């Protein structure tokens, strides 16, 4: 049984999933990106399985090379966008931690409002 057409189709599907993930990351649709990750991983596993079953010819490897290049480029761009997002989240967590420390240090004043007073008498 010739699995070569199926392998080529699986690569095409992986390219589509890769492009979807890049679009979602570019549009900052993080929840959707995470949800699409499993389909991407499954597609990669299917390609690995099919590649083990057949030995792709040199011609087929040449046909697949541009798809692999595109997938790797997309993956690199998605990783860059994710790193930017992680940096943003780390900054927000840091700000939240500072706010919590300030509230903890100054917020528990027994219900009294501390304000400067005029004691010039």
From Swiss-Prot:
Localization per Swiss-Prot or TrEMBL: Cytoplasm, Cytosol
Residue span of region Required for homodimerization: 1-50
UniProt keyword list: Bacterial flagellum biogenesis, Chaperone, Cytoplasm, Repressor, Transcription, Transcription regulation
Region FliD binding: start-end pairs: 60-98
Keyword Transcription annotated: yes
InterPro entries: FliT
Cellular compartments per GO CC: cytosol
Superkingdom assignment: Bacteria
GO biological process: bacterial-type flagellum organization; negative regulation of bacterial-type flagellum assembly; protein folding
KW Acyltransferase (keyword) present: no
Signal peptide region: none
Family: Belongs to the FliT family.
UniProt subunit comment: Homodimer. Interacts with FliD and FlhC.
Protein function: Dual-function protein that regulates the transcription of class 2 flagellar operons and that also acts as an export chaperone for the filament-capping protein FliD. As a transcriptional regulator, acts as an anti-FlhDC factor; it directly binds FlhC, thus inhibiting the binding of the FlhC/FlhD complex to class 2 promoters, resulting in decreased expression of class 2 flagellar operons. As a chaperone, effects FliD transition to the membrane by preventing its premature polymerization, and by directing it to the export apparatus.
Protein name: Flagellar protein FliT
